[in-house]
Design a protein with these regions (language model features):
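Conserved HGGG/HGGXW glycine-rich cap/lid loop of the alpha/beta-hydrolase fold
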Residues: 1-48
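Structural signature of beta-strand start/N-cap positions in the alpha/beta core
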Residues: 7, 33, 72-75, 96-99
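Glycine-rich His-Gly loop
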Residues: 10-13, 80, 198
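Active-site loop/oxyanion-hole signature of alpha/beta-hydrolase fold enzymes
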Residues: 35-77
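Gly/Ala-rich beta-loop-alpha elbow adjacent to hydrolase catalytic centers
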Residues: 78-82, 86
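Flexible "cap/lid" loop of the alpha/beta hydrolase fold
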Residues: 87, 91, 98-127
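Conserved alpha/beta-hydrolase catalytic His-Asp/Glu region
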Residues: 111-113, 130-187
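Short beta-strand/loop motif that positions the catalytic acidic residue
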Residues: 189, 195-197
């Protein structure tokens, strides 16, 4: 629709896949040009990420995507790791973002979240891909939702196992998230920002 001039960018969390946002796309495309993207390193055939991969690298990737799409400004929605990508883009290239919506970010990593991350990492390293993928819903969704959506969840898990990214990439992304300290960057961001957290 040529009458829609504003662009809305969605950035996913640790999984990094654009299809995380699929349930929201139909609604938002009525009001915005929508851009969703798979983050670097999350495809089955992705090249290995560098050993010192950082959140700033994820932000640089998005800046490059925006420039390649000739986008001079956009609104931004990010979930968890994706929220921090938005913060870093706002710091690196503030002119590219107008408003930010940050879902489930944190100002510092608390013990509970760190424990969840460490357990997921241990599952992947010592038990394998299937256990890592099938445990993910337990960390992300309430029990009732899991029970009510068993079929679609199982289908998604089976697809995720088949298409799993290189394990070193998953660990590099997880470690970059665990190491990230958002407070300093957040203090420099002057954009209108809505934070939604539970």
């Amino acid at each position: 629709d040529k009458s829609i001039t504003k662009t809305l960018v969605f950035s996913s969390g640790l999984g990094g896949h654009a299809n995380f946002w699929q349930p929201q796309i139909d609604f938002f495309t009525q009001h915005f040009q929508v851009l969703c993207y798979d983050q670097q390193g999350v495809q089955q055939d992705s090249e290995l990420l560098s050993s010192n991969y950082q959140l700033k690298d994820l932000a640089t990737e998005l800046v490059d995507i925006l420039k390649c799409n000739n986008l001079s400004s956009c609104h931004f929605v990010g979930h968890a790791l994706g929220a921090f990508i938005g913060l870093e883009v706002a710091a690196q290239a503030p002119q590219l973002l107008e408003k930010l919506v940050l879902l489930n970010p944190w100002d510092e990593l608390d013990f509970y979240t760190l424990k969840c991350f460490n357990l997921r990492q241990s599952l992947l390293e010592h038990t394998g891909i299937e256990a890592y993928v099938k445990a993910q819903a337990i960390f992300l969704y309430p029990p009732q939702w899991i029970s009510e959506n068993a079929q679609i969840l199982t289908e998604q898990e089976n697809q995720a196992i088949v298409k799993f990214a290189p394990i070193p990439n998953v660990l590099a992304r997880l470690n970059s998230l665990k190491a990230y300290q958002p407070k300093t960057t957040a203090a420099t961001v002057n954009h209108p920002t809505l934070v939604i957290s539970n």
